[in-house]
Structures are given as structure tokens and as C-alpha cells.
């Protein structure tokens, strides 16, 4: 006899080379990043960036779901931005799959009105270095004599 499937979705957020993967399932409102609570995310200055989806939508929308976030790659700032994007995308996906479409549209509109990067990844990437200079665009100084 098969066990009943748990209501869960998996979403990712990206910023530069940082990737955050969120497992969102029915629960009590716990949000953990790499095993520790989201309240302990470092650096403290950027902690509220990770909290933005929660503060925008209100804690009541997160009470019924648990989120486990694994983040790797990139720097501290990029990781925070990847975390906030994956939280927002996971909640929208959870609402679409297990709650009604009207609530999902409401959540998505609130997030889009505040900041589009909460749901849409930033496509900019670091340009590779070329020969003839120190970086991607700068060239070595040219001498005529």
C-alpha cells in the first residue's frame, strides 16, 4: 500500500552564480536556510532582504507551510537575493498547486508590484576576460614609439 504523497513543491532562485533551492511543504511555518532558522541569516544588514517576501505577504500566508532552503555558490549578497527569490517563487508555486488560483494571483501581484526580481531572475552574468588586456573590456596601453 502506497503512502499518501505530501503536498510539496520545489523551486529555485538564482543571482549571479548563487543558487537557492526551496522545498516547500505543508507544515507549521518553519523557514530554515541550510539547516538554521532564517532569523539567523548572515550578514545582519541583508537579513531583511531575505525577509522581504514574508514581510510583504504577511506571516499568515506562511503559517501553513514549512520551507527548507539549500543555498550554495556566489557571495553573501548574491545568496541572500537567491534565497528571497526562491522563497517567493516557492510560495507562488505552492498556492497554485494546492490552494486556489485567486489566492495565487493575489500573492503574485503583491510581489510583482513591489519588486520584479522576487519572481524573475536577473539575466546579467560576468563577462569573460579576453586577451590583450587585464579584464573583459580594458586593454593594455598602446604606444606609438
From Swiss-Prot:
It is found in: Cytoplasm. InterPro entries: Ribosomal_Su5_D2-typ_SF, Ribosomal_uS9, Ribosomal_uS9_CS, Ribsml_uS5_D2-typ_fold_subgr. Pfam families: Ribosomal_S9. Keywords: Cytoplasm, Ribonucleoprotein, Ribosomal protein. Signal peptide: none annotated. GO terms for biological process: maturation of SSU-rRNA from tricistronic rRNA transcript (SSU-rRNA, 5.8S rRNA, LSU-rRNA); translation. GO terms for molecular function: RNA binding; structural constituent of ribosome. Disulfide bonds: none annotated. GO terms for cellular component: cytosolic small ribosomal subunit. It comes from the Eukaryota. PANTHER family: RIBOSOMAL PROTEIN S16, RIBOSOMAL PROTEIN S9. Belongs to the universal ribosomal protein uS9 family. This is Small ribosomal subunit protein uS9.
Amino acid at each position: 500500500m502506497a503512502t499518501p504523497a505530501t503536498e510539496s513543491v520545489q523551486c529555485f532562485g538564482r543571482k549571479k552564480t548563487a543558487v537557492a533551492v526551496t522545498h516547500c511543504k505543508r507544515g507549521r511555518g518553519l523557514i530554515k536556510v541550510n539547516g538554521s532558522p532564517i532569523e539567523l541569516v548572515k550578514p545582519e544588514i541583508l537579513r531583511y532582504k531575505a525577509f522581504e517576501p514574508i514581510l510583504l505577504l504577511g506571516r499568515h500566508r506562511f503559517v501553513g507551510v514549512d520551507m527548507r532552503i539549500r543555498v550554495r555558490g556566489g557571495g553573501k549578497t548574491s545568496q541572500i537575493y537567491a534565497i528571497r527569490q526562491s522563497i517567493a517563487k516557492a510560495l507562488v508555486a505552492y498556492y497554485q498547486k494546492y490552494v486556489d488560483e485567486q489566492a495565487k494571483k493575489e500573492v503574485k501581484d503583491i510581489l510583482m508590484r513591489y519588486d520584479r526580481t522576487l519572481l524573475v531572475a536577473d539575466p546579467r552574468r560576468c563577462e569573460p576576460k579576453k586577451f590583450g588586456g587585464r579584464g573583459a573590456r580594458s586593454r593594455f596601453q598602446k604606444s606609438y614609439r
